[in-house]
Each structure stands twice: as C-alpha cells, then as structure tokens.
C-alpha cells in the first residue's frame, strides 16, 4: 500500500460523520499517518474540526447534503462517529463503491435498539436481559408484567443514556413512557422494555476486524475495559483498564463480543458493552466505532482504540494490542449553559504525578455535557482511579 501526501494527488483521505471528542482523537491519529481529513457535523467548531483539513456544517439527517459532500470529497472511507445520521445515505454511497466504516448495515443495526436486540438475542443468540417492545402505555404495562417490576424502558433510538427510565410499578408507566419518548431520536414511538437487573460490573470489550494480506479477515479483542456509572446515571463517568474481573468472565465477554462483531461484519473497532449481574454475563449494546469508555486506552495501551480504527479504515493491520500499564479515566462535566467556557485549576490537577488532562474544545456547555477527560496511570488500577477522581474534582468549568 502507498500513502500519499495530504492535499496532493494520491493522498489517502478519510471523512468523519460526526466531529466529537472520539472523532477528534481519530483525526489526530490519521494526521499522524499523513492522511487527509474531513469532518462533517451539525455545529461549527466541533472538537474534530479543530484538527481536520476541512470541515462542513450541515444537518446530519439531511441525506442529500451528506451525500453531495461525500461525492465531492471521494474519501477512501467514511467513518460514522455518531449514530444520529441518515443511514439510508450510508447504504446508498456504500452501494456506489465508497467504503463505510464499519459498514452501513452495522451502523443501521447499532443505532436501533430494537433491531440490535433482535439481532443479538435472536440471530447471534448471545445472552441478554428479558425484553419486549411497546408502542403505548397499555403495551408497556403488559411487557412490564412479562419481564417483572422493576423494569427499564428505553427509546428505540437515543444516545448516551438519554431516555432510560426505571418503572417500579404500574402507576408510573404513563409518565415514564412519555419521558422516554421525549428523548427519542427520530419519529419512532416504540420503546424497548427490559428486565431490570442489579449490575455488579460493566465491561467494554473493544473488538476489531481488519483485512489480512492473504485475503481473509482477522477479528481480535483488546483486554476488556471496566467502567461504572452511579445509580440512576446512564452516561459514561469513569473507566479503567485492565478490567478487574475473573478470567471466566473475561472469556465469556470476549466470546460474546466476537460473535456479535463477526456477524455485523465490516472493518474497524466496535465497543461491545457487557453487563455482569451476579453469575450472569449479559450482552447490552454495541457501538460501531471507538467507545467513550475506551478513551482510557490513550494511556493504558500500546495502541489506542482510535489508532486501531484508523488503521482498519486504511486497510492496515493491527496484529495485537497490549495493555502496558494500569490506567483510569474520569470525565469533566459542565453545569449550566455557557459560550466559550474556561477551565480552572488545570494546573493543580497536573501536579498529581501520572495525570493528563484532555479538554475537547467544545464551544458551548450545557448541563452534564462532557467537556474533557482526566487520564492517569498508576501502579494499580485503584491508584489510577484515585488520581483521576482527585484531579477531575479540582477542575471547574466556568
């Protein structure tokens, strides 16, 4: 393979649909490899736009606009960084010979909880919580009786835990159904109703596929990342690497992740979410891209999840990824709305040995928006976790 020079004829070019913090890290990895980079997002000054060669600001559901930009740029691959995109456009450009990462079908399945649950539980046959689907409060009541109270409902499409509602008894059904749908993406009025389990541990199995020079495909897993969310919080807060669970759990989680990812196909890295509840190891969801909990691999691994995805997009191999040190990551969250925020006490956070701070450069804050992340290495996972908790508590967003 030849890699040309950016902005000249023969350059390799990658285009991202979505320019958040995950996209930013991927663009940086692509820049390190001499790749021309293009980012599309719904708002200007998105994090990945700061480091890309070119940017476009469009409605991410406007299939015509997205398609026209992709046809103009003719990238070597299109990388879906977010799920809130027009999947019909991805299928169309893929049929016209433009590579979509990991593939258009996988993106479509992964952004739709109902399609994904049917795919995982009924086609791939990996263990999940008991579940059902509903389109009205009456149907939710029936499903809740089937799976048992308490149960949890989620919109068919949403991200970062938005719209996840726990129902403890029948009197809450109408209110929780309405609340779930207020966070739904698109026009769907369908929810998934799931058995509520007490989660003891949560893992992300970063699983990736790349083409072999012999013509085959290799599927590999990185030693799992562990993460936790406080009770009632459904978005990412903290992760650490390597996971501190038994080898039996690691084996089952890796087996389920490999099955799901091989059935989805394509190339690149997938973040497969696994829940551990008592002696049950359960598939939860999968992201068809680098995972937010995998930000910790920026310091824990010899090759980050972002570099793995970029390599696969270019058709390059990643034979192995090794965990080189215990590490942890903790988010920096905003409170309230503000334009052009400032960050206080970064210097104090960096006085802690082994700590790094990554500020994403988002132009606007809103309550609980992820604005940065603290990373730390240590002699143990517990030491690294203590460092990131202390450092993240010092940093204020104002």
Swiss-Prot record:
<keyword id="KW-0479">Metal-binding</keyword>
<dbReference type="Pfam" id="PF22660">
    <property type="entry name" value="RS_preATP-grasp-like"/>
</dbReference>
<comment type="function">
    <text>Involved in the de novo purine biosynthesis. Catalyzes the transfer of formate to 5-phospho-ribosyl-glycinamide (GAR), producing 5-phospho-ribosyl-N-formylglycinamide (FGAR). Formate is provided by PurU via hydrolysis of 10-formyl-tetrahydrofolate.</text>
</comment>
<feature type="binding site">
    <location>
        <position position="81"/>
    </location>
    <ligand>
        <name>N(1)-(5-phospho-beta-D-ribosyl)glycinamide</name>
    </ligand>
</feature>
<feature type="binding site">
    <location>
        <position position="154"/>
    </location>
    <ligand>
        <name>ATP</name>
    </ligand>
</feature>
<dbReference type="GO" id="GO:0005829">
    <property type="term" value="C:cytosol"/>
</dbReference>
<feature type="binding site">
    <location>
        <begin position="21"/>
        <end position="22"/>
    </location>
    <ligand>
        <name>N(1)-(5-phospho-beta-D-ribosyl)glycinamide</name>
    </ligand>
</feature>
<dbReference type="GO" id="GO:0005524">
    <property type="term" value="F:ATP binding"/>
</dbReference>
<dbReference type="InterPro" id="IPR013815">
    <property type="entry name" value="ATP_grasp_subdomain_1"/>
</dbReference>
<feature type="binding site">
    <location>
        <position position="362"/>
    </location>
    <ligand>
        <name>N(1)-(5-phospho-beta-D-ribosyl)glycinamide</name>
    </ligand>
</feature>
<keyword id="KW-0547">Nucleotide-binding</keyword>
<keyword id="KW-0436">Ligase</keyword>
<dbReference type="GO" id="GO:0004644">
    <property type="term" value="F:phosphoribosylglycinamide formyltransferase activity"/>
</dbReference>
<protein>
    <recommendedName>
        <fullName>Formate-dependent phosphoribosylglycinamide formyltransferase</fullName>
        <ecNumber>6.3.1.21</ecNumber>
    </recommendedName>
</protein>
<dbReference type="GO" id="GO:0043815">
    <property type="term" value="F:phosphoribosylglycinamide formyltransferase 2 activity"/>
</dbReference>
<dbReference type="Pfam" id="PF02222">
    <property type="entry name" value="ATP-grasp"/>
</dbReference>
<comment type="subunit">
    <text>Homodimer.</text>
</comment>
<comment type="pathway">
    <text>Purine metabolism; IMP biosynthesis via de novo pathway; N(2)-formyl-N(1)-(5-phospho-D-ribosyl)glycinamide from N(1)-(5-phospho-D-ribosyl)glycinamide (formate route): step 1/1.</text>
</comment>
<dbReference type="GO" id="GO:0000287">
    <property type="term" value="F:magnesium ion binding"/>
</dbReference>
<dbReference type="InterPro" id="IPR054350">
    <property type="entry name" value="PurT/PurK_preATP-grasp"/>
</dbReference>
<feature type="binding site">
    <location>
        <position position="285"/>
    </location>
    <ligand>
        <name>Mg(2+)</name>
    </ligand>
</feature>
<feature type="binding site">
    <location>
        <begin position="194"/>
        <end position="197"/>
    </location>
    <ligand>
        <name>ATP</name>
    </ligand>
</feature>
<keyword id="KW-0460">Magnesium</keyword>
<dbReference type="InterPro" id="IPR011761">
    <property type="entry name" value="ATP-grasp"/>
</dbReference>
<dbReference type="InterPro" id="IPR048740">
    <property type="entry name" value="PurT_C"/>
</dbReference>
<dbReference type="InterPro" id="IPR005862">
    <property type="entry name" value="PurT"/>
</dbReference>
<dbReference type="InterPro" id="IPR003135">
    <property type="entry name" value="ATP-grasp_carboxylate-amine"/>
</dbReference>
<dbReference type="Pfam" id="PF21244">
    <property type="entry name" value="PurT_C"/>
</dbReference>
<feature type="binding site">
    <location>
        <begin position="369"/>
        <end position="370"/>
    </location>
    <ligand>
        <name>N(1)-(5-phospho-beta-D-ribosyl)glycinamide</name>
    </ligand>
</feature>
<dbReference type="InterPro" id="IPR016185">
    <property type="entry name" value="PreATP-grasp_dom_sf"/>
</dbReference>
<feature type="binding site">
    <location>
        <position position="202"/>
    </location>
    <ligand>
        <name>ATP</name>
    </ligand>
</feature>
<dbReference type="GO" id="GO:0006189">
    <property type="term" value="P:'de novo' IMP biosynthetic process"/>
</dbReference>
<feature type="binding site">
    <location>
        <position position="273"/>
    </location>
    <ligand>
        <name>Mg(2+)</name>
    </ligand>
</feature>
<feature type="domain" description="ATP-grasp">
    <location>
        <begin position="118"/>
        <end position="314"/>
    </location>
</feature>
<comment type="similarity">
    <text>Belongs to the PurK/PurT family.</text>
</comment>
<feature type="binding site">
    <location>
        <position position="113"/>
    </location>
    <ligand>
        <name>ATP</name>
    </ligand>
</feature>
<keyword id="KW-0658">Purine biosynthesis</keyword>
<keyword id="KW-0067">ATP-binding</keyword>
<feature type="binding site">
    <location>
        <position position="292"/>
    </location>
    <ligand>
        <name>N(1)-(5-phospho-beta-D-ribosyl)glycinamide</name>
    </ligand>
</feature>
């Amino acid at each position: 393979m030849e890699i040309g020079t950016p902005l000249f004829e023969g350059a390799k070019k990658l285009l991202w649909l979505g320019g958040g913090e995950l996209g930013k890290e991927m663009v940086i990895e692509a820049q390190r490899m001499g790749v021309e980079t293009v980012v599309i997002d719904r708002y200007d000054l998105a994090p990945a736009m700061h480091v890309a060669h070119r940017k476009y600001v469009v409605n991410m559901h406007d299939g015509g606009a997205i398609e026209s930009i992709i046809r103009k740029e003719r990238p070597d691959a299109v990388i879906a960084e977010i799920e809130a995109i027009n999947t019909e456009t991805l299928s169309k450009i893929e049929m016209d010979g433009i590579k979509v990462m990991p593939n258009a079908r996988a993106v479509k399945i992964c952004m739709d909880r109902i399609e994904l649950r049917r795919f995982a539980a009924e086609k791939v046959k990996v263990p999940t919580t008991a579940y059902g689907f509903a389109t009205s409060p009456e149907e939710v009541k029936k499903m809740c009786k089937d799976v048992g109270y308490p149960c949890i409902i989620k919109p068919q499409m949403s991200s970062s835990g938005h719209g996840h509602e726990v129902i403890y008894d029948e009197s809450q059904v109408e209110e929780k159904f309405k609340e779930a749908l207020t966070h739904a993406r698109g026009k769907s009025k369908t929810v998934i109703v799931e058995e509520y389990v007490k989660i003891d541990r949560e893992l992300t199995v970063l699983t990736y596929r790349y083409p072999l020079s012999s013509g085959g495909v290799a599927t590999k897993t990185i030693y799992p990342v562990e993460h936790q969310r406080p009770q009632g919080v459904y978005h990412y807060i903290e992760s650490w690497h390597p996971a501190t669970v038994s080898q039996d759990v690691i084996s089952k989680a890796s087996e389920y992740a490999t099955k799901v990812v091989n059935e989805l196909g394509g190339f690149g890295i997938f973040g497969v979410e696994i829940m551990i509840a008592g002696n049950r190891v359960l598939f939860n969801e999968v992201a068809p891209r680098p995972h937010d909990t995998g930000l910790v691999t920026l310091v824990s691994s010899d090759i980050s999840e972002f570099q793995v995805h970029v390599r696969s997009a270019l058709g390059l191999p990643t034979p192995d990824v090794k965990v080189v040190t215990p590490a942890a990551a903790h988010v920096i969250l905003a409170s309230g709305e503000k334009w052009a925020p400032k960050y206080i006490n970064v210097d104090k956070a960096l006085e802690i040995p082994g700590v790094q701070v990554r500020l994403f450069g988002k132009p606007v804050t809103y309550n609980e928006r992820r604005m940065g992340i603290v990373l730390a290495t240590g002699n143990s996972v517990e030491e690294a976790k203590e460092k990131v908790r202390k450092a993240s508590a010092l940093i204020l967003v104002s």
